[in-house]
Amino acid sequence: MLEKILNSRSFIIFSLPFFLGLISVFSFQPFNFTFINFIIIPALFLVITYVQKRSKNIYRKKPYLRNLFFIGYFFGIGFFLSGTYWISYSLTFDENLKLLIPFSIILIPLFLGLFFGFASLFLGPFMRNNYSSFFLFCLIFSLTDYLRGNILSGFP
C-alpha cells in the first residue's frame, strides 16, 4: 500500500512543492545562498503549470483548482516549517510557555501556508507556459507575501 502511494505521480507532484519550500529557506541568512531562488521559483512555476494543464485535460471541470491550492499550500508549509523554527526558541524561557512549542512549530506554518495556497488558487485559471504567466506568477506571489506581512502586522 505504501509502495503504491510512493510510486504514484500525485505523491511526487504534491511532495515536490513541500521540499522546494523547505529548501528555499537556505536563501536567507545565515546561509545566504540566494541563487537557490533562481531554481526554486521556476520549478514551482513549472509544477503549477503542469498540474493546471494536466488536471484540466483529465477532469475538464473545476477540481484542478483544488490541486493548485494544495501545491501552493504545501510549498507554504515547507517554507514556513523550516523558516519559523525560531519562534519556539522564544517560548523556552518560561516554563508555562513550553506547552505552546508544538503548536508554534505546527500551527503557524499550517496557517501561513494558506497565503501561498490562495495565491496559486487565484493564479490557476490564468496560467499558461509563457513569459507573461511567469511574470503574473511572480506578481501574485509577491502581492500575497506583501499582504501577509501587512495583515499580520509585519510578521516576517
State what each model feature region is.
Residues 2-156:
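Membrane-embedded alpha-helical bundles of multi-pass enzymes
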